[in-house]
């Protein structure tokens, strides 16, 4: 039970709104964890006892101090677009909505480095960057509704990963403003080295209030659809495109059965294995040549900027899963890095699992090397069948990033990050920030 003294104390904080209606408590205690039947069962009853929405960093400090004083768990929430229960309060307590901290504080005109508050929507941030000829390097497919702080705290990569790798790669996150959960909370300005431990930590070891990020030069991305005569050709062409000397922002590979189930949005109506590409204008002719050489048919849809919300990026990454689940909630998914050569693993798994496994691949840059990751659609047949499938993938050399578990470690490489745990001990010694999500601390 939330102490009355805490409610009274928070009610007196300027620039802080308290939400207490049952509908608000339910709504803001959820994210998109229903992608996973496992998490859906585990998290369905989790509820905050109070939701607060600060408008200033000072209000954040006051909330942190009050929760620490009363020993009440505090869970942070951006837009709630995460898929792993990152912002779900496992131990109830207070959920703090960060969406009102949304100012773009500065953009360096020469370097493009941006300092932005955590609650800024990525679409709004990208719009501000475009005014000075810059753009975000990495985005989730939920970029229109996701906050930049939520992406750093709970995401890992997405659109742009084929060129820029993943968020934890050195060079993306250049600094953080962080409020600690100490007895006397502090506002810290962390440089890149110290900030790294809070990157993809689910808000368990510090409260991110602002970020400093590197950006990229704006490109007028062109949308290309390439229909291939067979699956082997599609996978091979994806490898050729990702290794070509072209500016490539997205390389999605979909087997024909997935293409049939996605919104068509005036795309070519063919039942074929398909590539979805975002490329620079000077790369269109190169992709055309590569496609023609293997008997594939390329369609140039034009500039992405002209698509007005129904572009190819909304068919990629987790939006592929979203669209299929809207048609049939019996689909769930996995995340994995495929072994090389990829086709052997892909075909072996397909032979065993048949139509219960539909292939969706994404080109990524992993530790400086072009690789193919996969977010396959998986027909839900129960937890035991899912575990058997994951073990089969591991046996073939795939690296699984399990989207059906709650902890930072479980969804990653399965090992404890000592720096993340040490940072939690330093900034949240009582373990009140998003408890239960950082396994190394819990254990």
Map each language-model feature to its residues.
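N-terminal flexible segment immediately upstream of the FAD-binding catalytic core
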Residues: 1-65, 81-112, 258-266, 305-328, ...
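Short amphipathic alpha-helices in soluble, non-transmembrane regions
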Residues: 9, 67, 237-242, 283-296, ...
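General beta-strand structural signal in soluble alpha/beta enzymes
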Residues: 18-22, 53-54, 74-78, 96-98, ...
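Conserved glycine-rich FAD pyrophosphate-binding loop
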Residues: 77-79, 86-93, 99, 143, ...
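FAD-binding subdomain of flavoenzyme oxidoreductases
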Residues: 103-107, 122-123, 127-247, 251-252
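Helix N-cap motif at beta-to-alpha junctions
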Residues: 230-232, 278-285, 339-342, 378-383
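A conserved active-site cap/scaffold subdomain adjacent to cofactor or substrate pockets
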Residues: 245-248, 257-300
